[in-house]
From Swiss-Prot:
Entries under Pfam families matching the protein: Hexapep (PF00132), LpxD (PF04613)
GO molecular function, one term: N-acyltransferase activity
Active-site residues annotated for this sequence: 246 (proton acceptor)
Pathway field: Bacterial outer membrane biogenesis; LPS lipid A biosynthesis
Catalysis performed (reactions): a UDP-3-O-[(3R)-3-hydroxyacyl]-alpha-D-glucosamine + a (3R)-hydroxyacyl-[ACP] = a UDP-2-N,3-O-bis[(3R)-3-hydroxyacyl]-alpha-D-glucosamine + holo-[ACP] + H(+)
GO biological process: lipid A biosynthetic process
Binding partners and assembly: Homotrimer.
Gene3D superfamilies (alphabetical): Hexapeptide repeat proteins (2.160.10.10), MurE/MurF, N-terminal domain (3.40.1390.10)
Name of the protein in question: UDP-3-O-acylglucosamine N-acyltransferase 1
Length: 347
C-alpha cells in the first residue's frame, strides 16, 4: 500500500514545506527513530525535533507551532497541520489493513427464525443469534459470537470473534466490540441469608444499554442491572480488561483505561478519563470532565473538572502536598529529635 506525498497532503487539506519538485512515494508510517526511507513520521512536540534531525523518514506530519523550526533542520518535506496527532489518525486510516473479508451469512451460523437481520449483514461461522434479536444494516458479526434473546444491535457495528451479548442488551450504531468482551453478564449481587449461614444470589433482571460510536476492548465485562439499565454513553471508549458493575451509568465521550474497576451503581459524567488500574467504590459520583489517575482508589465523590489520584484518592494538588510532607518526614523527625533532646524530652 502506498500513496504520494501530494495525495496525503490533499487528503489532509494541508500545505507542504520543502515540497520537492518530483513525486515522493510514502509506503509506511512509523516513529521517527524507527523510520526508513519512504516512511512518513509524526513530529508534534518541541522535544521531538532532535529525533527529526537523525531520522531516516522521507517526510513528516508536523504541528504548525514548530513547523518553521523544523524546516530549518533539513530540506525534507513537511506536511503542516494544526493538530499533528489527529492528522496522523486520518492517514492511519488510509494505511490500515482492511477487515477480514466476510460476506453474507455463513452456513454454519445458528440464527433463530424470529431474529430480524438487516441489509448487508455478515455473520460468521458458529455465531449464535437468539430469539427476537435485531441486527441493523451493514453490521459485521465474526465467528463464535453469541447474541442472546431480545438483544438489539444497531447499524454499522463490528463485533469481533467470541463476543458474548446477553439477553435484552441494546447496542447503538457504529460500535466496535473486541474479542471476548462480555456484555450483560450477571451483576455481582449477593446477600447473607437470614441465618447468616449461606450467601443468597440476588437475581438481576435489568439490561445493558450501549450508545452509538462506543468501542469496547477485549476481555472487558459489563454487568447487567439488578433492575433498570447499566448505561454506556455515546462515543465512550473502553480499553481491554475493564470491569463495569451493575447499574453503572457512564456518560458521553469518556475514556476508561485497562484494568480499571468500576463498582456497582457508580455514576460517571461526560468526558471523564479514568486511567489504568483505577478502582471506584460503589455508589460514588464522578463529575463531568474529571480525571482519575492510574491506580487511584476512589472512595468518595469527585466533583466535575477535578483531577484525583492516589490511594485513597485525593485532589491532585492536595495529594502533592501530602507527598512533599512525607518526603520531608525524615528530615523533620531529625530536627524534632534535636529539639526534644535540648529540652530533655524522650521521643
Amino acid at each position: 500500500m502506498q500513496y504520494t506525498l501530494k495525495q496525503i497532503s490533499e487528503h489532509l487539506n494541508a500545505k507542504v514545506i520543502n515540497e520537492p519538485s518530483g513525486e515522493v512515494i510514502i509506503t509506511g508510517l512509523t516513529y521517527a527513530e524507527q523510520a526508513k526511507e519512504n516512511d512518513l513520521t509524526l513530529i508534534d512536540k518541541q522535544e521531538h525535533i532532535k529525533l527529526w534531525q537523525n531520522s531516516k523518514a522521507t517526510a513528516a506530519i508536523v504541528s504548525k507551532k514548530i513547523s518553521k523550526e523544523l524546516a530549518q533542520v533539513n530540506d525534507k518535506p513537511l506536511i503542516v497541520v494544526n493538530n499533528a496527532d489527529l492528522a496522523m489518525a486520518k492517514i492511519l486510516e488510509l494505511f490500515s489493513v482492511p477487515y477480514p473479508e466476510q460476506n453474507g451469512i455463513h452456513e454454519k451460523a445458528i440464527i433463530d427464525p424470529t431474529a430480524k437481520i438487516g441489509k448487508n449483514v455478515s455473520i460468521g461461522p458458529s455465531a449464535y443469534i437468539g430469539k427476537n434479536v435485531e441486527i441493523g444494516d451493514n453490521t459485521i458479526i465474526y465467528a463464535n459470537v453469541c447474541i442472546y434473546n431480545d438483544a438489539k444491535v444497531g447499524t454499522n457495528c463490528i463485533i469481533w470473534p467470541s463476543v458474548i451479548i446477553r439477553d435484552r442488551t441494546i447496542i447503538g450504531h457504529f460500535c466496535r466490540l473486541c474479542s471476548n468482551c462480555s456484555i450483560g453478564s450477571d451483576g455481582f449481587g449477593y446477600r447473607p441469608s437470614e441465618d447468616g449461614r449461606t450467601i443468597v444470589r440476588i437475581p438481576h433482571i435489568g439490561n445493558v444499554v450501549i450508545g452509538s460510536f462506543v468501542d469496547i476492548g477485549s476481555n472487558t465485562c459489563i454487568n447487567n442491572a439488578k433492575y433498570g439499565s447499566t448505561i454506556i454513553g455515546d462515543y465512550t471508549k473502553i480499553d481491554n480488561l475493564v470491569q463495569i458493575g451493575h447499574n453503572v451509568i457512564i456518560g458521553k465521550g469518556c475514556m476508561i483505561c485497562g484494568q480499571a474497576g468500576i463498582s456497582g451503581s457508580v455514576t460517571i459524567g461526560d468526558g471523564v478519563i479514568i486511567a489504568g488500574n483505577a478502582g471506584i467504590k460503589d455508589h460514588t459520583n464522578i463529575g463531568s470532565d474529571a480525571r482519575i489517575g492510574g491506580k487511584a482508589g476512589v472512595m468518595w465523590d469527585v466533583p466535575a473538572g477535578e483531577s484525583h489520584m492516589g490511594y485513597p484518592a485525593y485532589k491532585d494538588s492536595e495529594l502533592a502536598k501530602q507527598w512533599i510532607a512525607i518526603r520531608k518526614l525524615p528530615e523533620t523527625m531529625k530536627k524534632l529529635k534535636a529539639i526534644a533532646k535540648s529540652l530533655n524530652i524522650d521521643l
